Amino acid sequence: MDLKDYKNVVVFAEQREGNIQSVAYELLGKARDLADTLGEKVVAMLLGCGIKDQAQKLIEFGADEVIVADCPELKDYLSEQYTQVVDQIVKERCPNIVLYGATTIGRDMAPRIAARLKTGLTADCTKLEVVSDEKSNGEPQFRMTRPAFGGNLMATIICPNTRPQMSTVRPGVMQKRQREEGRQGVVTMFVPKFDTSKFHVKLVETIKEDKAVVDIADAKILVSGGRGVQNKEGFDKLQALADVIGGVVSSSRAMVDNGVMPHDRQVGQTGKTVRPNLYMACGISGAIQHLAGMEESDFIIAINKDKFAPIFSVADLGIVGDLHKIVPMLTERLKKEMEK
């Protein structure tokens, strides 16, 4: 096939226990933008057991067609079963672009699909776009951008010689479209052909992690600390501020690597992407990999001793000074204001 014969933008719509994950709707929003630019359609792949009724939601969030594989073998995610089905669908449909969430499932499955199709895969993308310019000789070109070299620069990657072009995108990076209730689309049932001789793994039990704390990706207010916070005592100051304003404490990679904060509180390319209403960056210099995880916040306040810190380039309000003095003062002032 000629590369121009590959059409449409396909999204793997991840579901767990019959519930479509938010990242699927986020990817549909971006897929809709890409497809409209290319003059192509958006197709969602929905795999599971007893999930056919969920297809309409995907249409209402931007899909033109939903391909549903609904059978007992797909009740729980197992690498080989899901990979076989997605591989069959992609080979049958020959899409131009395929998008996956950079979740535990997406990160496990997408490389397997890429290897079977002998195509490329760009992981953990922060930006996806179709551009026509001199570099592409005026032809529409799909470009995938992600942090590289430890987050010290942003790399824009193309896949010029093979199809489909594939990317994984972390939850929270892209924005959902407004749901269009009643939107019309096509639901196509797909009957997979399994090679059971390759089913070498059996799911014995699923043990869910007990998460007693709020997921930072869901928080409306985040008070985030970096290397400048220094230690646990420094984070206690941030926690006091967060308690006053109804926020959640998060951190940069440096403080996770130092063992001061747990990984589930990390913001950035190797942590979580967040979009709170308010993001307070305290003692965070602003490495590219951190900015990639928080720059879409509605309002950003940065506190840093270094007036040249990169974090100020994305901040709506910047305070140059010692956070260990500023944060306690701010906390006390806010307490007094709230007591009035």
Positions of PLM-derived features:
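N-terminal glycine-rich FAD/FM-binding segment characteristic of electron-transfer flavoproteins
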Residues: 1-340
